[in-house]
C-alpha cells in the first residue's frame, strides 16, 4: 500500500467484504488461511493481466469475497453456508479452512483433490465466465466446447448429487464435478489452468529442471516468462506440465503419499483448457 494511498488495505485485502466472526481461536486461524489463499489468487490474476476491481470500484462488474460460517440456532439446528458465486460476490464457507472438515468432504464426495486455494480458483472462474464469456462473441464457441449453459442449473445439480458422474467421465471432463453443468465444467477447467500456471511459475523460479538417466522419461527445462506469456503458448504449457507432474507424482510416491496430480488430460479436456487459456489472454 502506498504511503499516500487513502485505502489502508492492500489490493487483496480490499476485496474482502465480510470476515468471519472472530470470537474463537479457530475462526481467527481460519481467516488467516482464507486471506493467504486469496492473496495467492489475486497475485495470479494480476500476473495474468485479468480485470480485477472491487465492487467499490465497479459496483456492476467488480468482485468481492465474504467468509461466513454456518449458523446454529438455540435448539441446535444448523443453517449451512454454501460456497459459491453470485453476481461478483464469492462466498467461502469458513469450514473449508479446517483441514479435517475439508478432507472429510473430499472423501464423502469422492474427490481426488480438494484445497482451499482450489475453491478460490474455481469460484473466480464463475466470475470470469460472466466477465469474459457471457454476452460476448466467445459465447457460441463456449457452447461448442462446453455445452449449452442455458440447461437448467438447479436440475443439473440435483441429478449430479443423486446419481453422480456418468461412466467414463474421465474421457471428456477434468473432474467428476465438471460433468454437472457447462458452468461447472468451465469453472473446473479455469481452476485447472490456474493450477498449471502457478505450479510451473514456482518450479521455474526455484530452478526445477529434469534430466533423467532413462531415455523414455520426460525432460523438463522451464524458460523464464511472465504468466500471461506462459498461458499464451498453450501447447508448450501442456508439454511442460506433463513433465512436471510426472516428477511430482514420482516424488510423492517415493514418500509413500498419494499422487500429487491425480488427473488425466484427455484430448477433449485439453481443448477445454485451451479455450480457457485463450479467454485469459484475449
Which residues make up each language-model segment?
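Cys/His-rich short segments
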Residues: 1-25
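Auxiliary, metal-adjacent structural segments of Zn-dependent hydrolase domains
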Residues: 28-99
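Short, glycine/acidic-rich hinge or "gate" loops at secondary-structure transitions
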Residues: 58, 137-148
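A short mid-domain helix/strand-loop element embedded in enzyme catalytic domains
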Residues: 81-107, 135, 157-168
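Short pre-active-site segment immediately N-terminal to the catalytic Zn-binding motif
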Residues: 100-120
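Active-site recognition of the HExxH zinc-binding catalytic motif
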Residues: 114-135, 187
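Acidic/histidine-rich catalytic neighborhood
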Residues: 143-189
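Pan-zinc metallopeptidase signature
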Residues: 178-282
Amino acid at each position: 500500500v502506498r504511503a499516500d494511498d487513502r485505502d489502508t488495505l492492500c489490493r487483496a485485502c480490499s476485496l474482502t467484504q465480510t470476515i468471519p466472526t472472530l470470537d474463537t481461536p479457530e475462526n481467527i486461524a481460519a481467516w488467516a488461511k482464507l486471506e493467504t489463499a486469496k492473496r495467492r489468487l489475486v497475485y495470479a490474476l494480476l500476473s495474468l493481466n485479468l480485470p480485477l476491481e472491487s465492487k467499490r470500484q465497479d459496483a456492476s462488474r467488480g468482485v468481492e469475497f465474504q467468509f461466513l460460517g454456518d449458523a446454529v440456532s438455540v435448539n441446535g439446528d444448523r443453517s449451512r453456508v454454501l460456497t459459491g458465486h453470485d453476481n461478483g460476490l464469492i462466498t467461502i464457507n469458513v469450514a473449508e479452512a479446517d483441514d479435517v472438515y475439508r478432507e472429510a468432504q473430499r472423501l464423502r464426495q469422492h474427490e481426488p483433490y480438494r484445497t482451499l486455494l482450489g475453491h478460490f480458483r474455481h469460484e473466480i472462474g464463475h466470475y470470469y465466465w460472466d466477465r469474459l464469456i457471457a454476452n460476448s462473441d466467445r459465447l457460441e464457441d463456449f457452447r461448442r466446447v462446453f455445452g449449452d449453459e442455458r440447461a437448467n442449473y438447479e436440475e443439473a445439480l440435483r441429478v449430479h448429487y443423486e446419481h453422480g458422474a456418468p461412466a467414463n467421465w474421465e474421457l471428456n471432463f477434468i473432474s467428476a464435478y465438471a460433468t454437472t453443468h457447462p458452468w461447472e465444467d468451465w469453472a473446473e477447467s479455469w481452476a485447472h489452468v490456474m493450477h498449471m500456471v502457478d505450479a510451473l511459475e514456482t518450479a521455474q523460479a526455484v530452478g526445477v529442471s529434469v534430466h533423467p538417466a532413462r531415455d523414455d522419461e520426460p525432460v523438463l527445462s522451464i524458460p523464464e516468462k511472465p504468466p500471461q506469456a506462459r498461458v499464451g503458448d498453450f501447447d508448450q504449457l501442456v508439454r511442460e506440465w506433463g513433465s512436471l507432474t510426472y516428477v511430482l507424482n514420482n516424488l510423492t510416491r517415493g514418500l509413500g503419499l498419494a499422487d500429487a496430480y491425480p488427473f488425466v488430460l484427455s484430448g477433449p479436456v485439453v481443448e477445454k483448457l485451451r479455450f480457457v487459456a485463450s479467454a485469459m489472454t484475449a
